[in-house]
């Protein structure tokens, strides 16, 4: 009988070991194949935070676009990187370091604070009080609104940064950073993503940085591992089919079950995964 761990590994396509160079090539070719199949698409759009995931996805996207231009002679193929801070970002230096590494064709900066604060104000005027946690999700959704707005004006597709360690724990905002058109990191766990950045020659600080969602005003820069109650090493071991402690296994599988709704399109009468 298949265990839940085995089911999750199969579902997310995680391999116990990888060749980083091969996986880099696989992701770039995947992005290029999508563009070739959809010739009306000319850009990829991605928000760059300064964290491991957007840095990796951004560099892969830029490499794919560079190759598309070289192979087709079509100079309209462009990667658009967007900085999407809420006001002043505490780790802005990391974001700038990521952009310097990615070297995007186009770099934009859009402050989401006015839009988020205006919506919070409108809701409060209507008698709806917004918690800090809920406001954090609004920030994530405003970032996705912005990316799709830019993509819509530039014949673009939005790249998502979802990977296996994030997906299994559903550690993303529904219709926020969970909303995207294409996921070049899907199948990789956290340490494998780190290995790809090393292969690509990224500065060490960009892949050794402590991962954080940094969405809540009252709890700035809270580490993902603190919020999840489990380390990425344990999550990665689990996804590679290794034995982890009973506590870690239970925590990971509880997050997986709790977040099932995030992995599905809106529920219809024919869906039964939630029962």
From Swiss-Prot:
SUPFAM superfamilies: Adenine nucleotide alpha hydrolases-like. It is an enzyme of class 6 (ligase). It comes from the Bacteria. One of its GO terms (biological process) is NAD biosynthetic process. Pfam families: NAD_synthase. Keywords: ATP-binding, Ligase, Magnesium, Metal-binding, NAD, Nucleotide-binding. Mg(2+) binds at residues 53, 166. ATP binds at residues 47-54, 161, 190, 212. GO terms for cellular component: cytoplasm. Belongs to the NAD synthetase family. HAMAP family: NadE_ammonia_dep. Homodimer. This is NH(3)-dependent NAD(+) synthetase. It comes from Enterococcus faecalis (strain ATCC 700802 / V583).
């Amino acid at each position: 009988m298949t265990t839940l761990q085995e089911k999750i590994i199969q579902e997310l396509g995680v391999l116990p070991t990888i060749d980083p160079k091969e996986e880099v090539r696989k992701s770039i070719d995947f992005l290029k194949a999508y563009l070739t199949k959809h010739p009306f698409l000319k850009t990829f759009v991605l928000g760059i935070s300064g964290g491991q995931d957007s840095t990796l996805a951004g560099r892969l996207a830029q490499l794919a676009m560079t190759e598309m231009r070289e192979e087709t002679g079509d100079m309209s193929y462009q990667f658009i990187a967007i900085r999407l801070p809420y006001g002043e970002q505490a780790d802005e230096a990391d974001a700038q370091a990521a952009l310097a590494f990615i070297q995007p064709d186009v770099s934009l900066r859009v402050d989401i604070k006015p839009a988020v604060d205006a919506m919070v104000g409108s809701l409060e005027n209507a008698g709806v009080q917004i918690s800090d946690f809920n406001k954090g999700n609004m920030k994530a959704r405003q970032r996705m609104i912005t990316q799709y707005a830019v993509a819509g004006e530039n014949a673009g597709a939005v790249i998502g940064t979802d990977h296996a360690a994030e997906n299994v724990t559903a550690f993303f905002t529904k219709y926020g950073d969970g909303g995207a058109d294409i996921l070049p990191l899907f199948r990789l766990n956290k340490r494998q993503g780190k290995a790809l950045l090393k292969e690509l020659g990224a500065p060490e600080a960009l892949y050794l940085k402590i991962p954080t969602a940094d969405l809540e005003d009252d709890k700035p820069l809270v580490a993902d591992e603190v919020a999840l109650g489990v380390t990425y090493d344990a999550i990665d071991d689990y996804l590679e089919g290794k034995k982890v402690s009973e506590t870690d296994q239970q925590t990971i599988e509880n997050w997986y079950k709790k977040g099932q709704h995030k992995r599905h399109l809106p529920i219809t009468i024919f869906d039964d995964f939630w029962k």
